[in-house]
Amino acid sequence: PIFAQAADKELSYVGYEQVPANAQALLIAKNSTIDSIQDLKGKRIAVQRGSSAHELLAKVLQKAGLSWQDIQPIWLPPADARAAFDKQSIDAWAIWEPYLSAAEQDAHAKVLIDGTAFPQTYSFYIGNPKFIQAYPEATAQFIHGLNQADQWVLKNQPQALSVYTQSTGLQPSIAQRVIDKRLKPSPIQTLTPEVVQAQQQIADLFQQVQLIPKHIQVQSTVWVAPSKP
């Protein structure tokens, strides 16, 4: 959402979900000579522009005391990044689930660092402001439906695994790893001041390292749910 807002796209944050800390990571090959995040200097790192992994990589570089000029970012979507990773034409890959578990199981990838090093990681649900303004009750029902689905997953683990496997085409063992990482429960809620502040800090970091061209105010795009009668 940060990149879209910085590009003046119309959007509204309608909800958020806590992301499991180990659901995204920076991967290296099993035979990699990279031992620490400081060793990323000069390395080719694949990441999808504007994704949560883009955010993760920005935080990793900051933690390592490196800049974007210190690395060679390779902008690739997950499928292309996986192919490059398998051919070892990249040195590291910033990625999220289920691609993370698939690479760990099939390519024996190693985790250099994951989200456990960075608290306050969230996944967001975004809506069209015009639709939300016209149909606020429908937006609230959408969030309610997601939470009903979350409760169903909790109570029907075998069926949830079957549905997830069939809908994604993942191997059952990989799908199970992804589900096992999932927070239980994993409620979707409207944004709290703490979540807005955390997202604002990321936006400020992105501006500081010139990943976005200007300052943005996250709060200005946050949807407020209608009050219950």
Question: Residues of each region from the PLM?
Answer:
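Short, glycine-/small- and polar/acidic-enriched structural segments
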Residues: 1-67, 72-75, 91-97, 110, ...
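Short polybasic/polar patches that bind polyanions
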Residues: 5, 62, 105, 166, ...
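Helix N-cap/coil-helix junction residues
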Residues: 9, 66, 170, 211-212
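Pocket-lining segment of extracytoplasmic ligand-binding domains
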Residues: 74, 79-166
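Secondary-structure end/capping motifs
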Residues: 134-211
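Conserved C-terminal helix/tail region of periplasmic/extracytoplasmic solute-binding proteins
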Residues: 203-229
